[in-house]
Amino acid sequence: MSPDLTHRSPEELTPEDSQAIGDLARRAARADGVDPLNEESLLALRHRTPGRVHVLAHDQDRLVGYGTLAHGSAEVVTDPDARKAGLGGRLLDALLEHDPELLLWAHGDMDGGRRLAASRGMVPRRPLWRMERPVAGEFSELPPVELPEGISVRPFVAGQDDEAWLRVNSRAFADHAEQGRMTAEDLTARTQEDWFDASGFLLLVDDTRDGEVVGFHWTKVDQLPVGEVYVVGVDPERQGEGLGRVATLVGLHHLADRGVETVELYVDGDNRAAVTTYGRLGFERAAVDVQYGPPV
């Protein structure tokens, strides 16, 4: 008997639904070695973020599949014991009914994700690289931080710096599908996560302009010994001053001081300038996610 599909609005999601989806994602991650849902999707579950589509697949009382869609971006996850029976395709079709032009994430770009995308006529549209570098042990020495004259570094202060950071973030990521649309609510949700540490949310400020925020490096340590370059940004008005490299190094030194041994980051594989910059800082590609969509 085929699993039953149920559509849920964010308001209709129950705590039991969210728990079951989290359990399903963990089962899939153990089997595949990669998380099937990104941070935005997981936060949306916890906070029941408006405007998101949820499709749940139950085999009797057991959740065996889940699909989610928001802002034209979709993810699908199936239970390892319920695969190769067309369930992933059914979930994707349900999401395509809401948005025929959606883009589908294939985390880890494994064979199953490729086949699912190809079965619906989708082609690779956007590669997202995970890059890594050591910050402890042999061959891990970091270049020194050389702050430009007039620039200093301080931690983010919640309730004081929100508006200034959101302004720089939206300008720095105006062309970025996810990061550029971050709202005050999104910022607050992340600062309330267990991993959040204000001392690792570092702002570059211009002391000659009343402490104006001109760049930032938000680091993340969820579980040692791995840390993350969560997001680095520089105000476009200040590009060309070397602040991107400075911000990156400030955060890397902070992570090393916290006891992190390996730092990872995510970058669009098509962004050759960013890939080159990170490569010069010792980062190498470790994995890739691919977003699939209709042919352009």
From Swiss-Prot:
Q: Which InterPro entries match?
A: Acyl_CoA_acyltransferase (IPR016181), GNAT_dom (IPR000182), MshD_Acetyltransferase (IPR050276), Mycothiol_AcTrfase (IPR017813)
Looking up PROSITE patterns in the UniProt record yields: GNAT (PS51186)
One Gene Ontology term of the biological-process aspect is: mycothiol biosynthetic process
Q: Which reaction does it catalyse?
A: 1D-myo-inositol 2-(L-cysteinylamino)-2-deoxy-alpha-D-glucopyranoside + acetyl-CoA = mycothiol + CoA + H(+)
Return the CDD domains for the record: NAT_SF (cd04301)
Ordered alphabetically, the record's keywords are:
Acyltransferase, Repeat, Transferase
Q: Which residues bind 1D-myo-inositol 2-(L-cysteinylamino)-2-deoxy-alpha-D-glucopyranoside?
A: E39, E178, K220, E228, Y266
Q: Which residues bind acetyl-CoA 2?
A: V232, G233, V234, Q239, G240, E241, G242, L243, G244, R245
Q: Which family does it belong to?
A: Belongs to the acetyltransferase family. MshD subfamily.
PANTHER family (alphabetical): L-AMINO ACID N-ACETYLTRANSFERASE, MYCOTHIOL ACETYLTRANSFERASE
Question: What's the protein called, per UniProt?
Answer: Mycothiol acetyltransferase
